Amino acid sequence: TYRIAAVEQLRTYANILDIPMRVIYDADEMKNVREELNGYDVVLIDTAGRSHKNREQRDDIERLILSVPEEEREIYLVLSVTTKYRDLLKITETYSQISDFRLVFTKLDETASLGNILNIRMATGAYLSYATFGQNVPDDISRTDAQLIAKQLLGGNE
């Protein structure tokens, strides 16, 4: 973790939801946490946003992902729809070397240009899962609505 107050923000959400929360700093700690949370159906792992260009940071994320057995993991790659297409391609290419993933697009409220959602979906073959459109948690996150995105791509619903 390196974002200021990120852990406290997650702890606040965990308290609101009345669920346990653990903080780990490397993949070596994952085994103990997995054993501790073994009775839960779902364990969410939130990693800090990292640059795909930084090899050390990519390696850290890869070790963390690979510390969870493949049959137990479902990876969501979170991308801003405002990021340039070429950069989105590089990001998805980098992380596709680590694991399969589903896509979450953020900041739909900050742009009228949603073409990158379709472009990246087609380039990666990854499933579109969620989208965010504001700062209000959890109100501004929803499952991806393909019909709404198609309508906006075609110039409607602005």
Summary of predicted features, one role per range:
Residues S129, F133-E158:
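Conserved phosphate-handling catalytic cores of large alpha/beta enzymes
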Residues T1-I4, D28-E29, G49-H52, V81-Y85, ...:
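Conserved nucleotide-binding/hydrolysis micro-motifs of P-loop NTPases
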Residues R22-R34:
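Cytosolic-facing regulatory segments adjacent to core modules
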Residues E35-G39, N119, S142-I149:
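Short, surface-exposed amphipathic charged segments that create phosphate/polyanion-binding patches used
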Residues E35-I45, Q57-T82:
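Inter-motif core of Ras-like GTPase G domains
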Residues I45, E71-L79, S96-F133, P138:
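Conserved beta-strand/loop subsegment of P-loop NTPase cores
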Residues A6-V7, H52-R58, D87-L89, S113-N116:
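Conserved ATPase-coupling elements of RecA-like P-loop NTPase cores
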Residues T1-I24:
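P-loop NTPase switch/communication element
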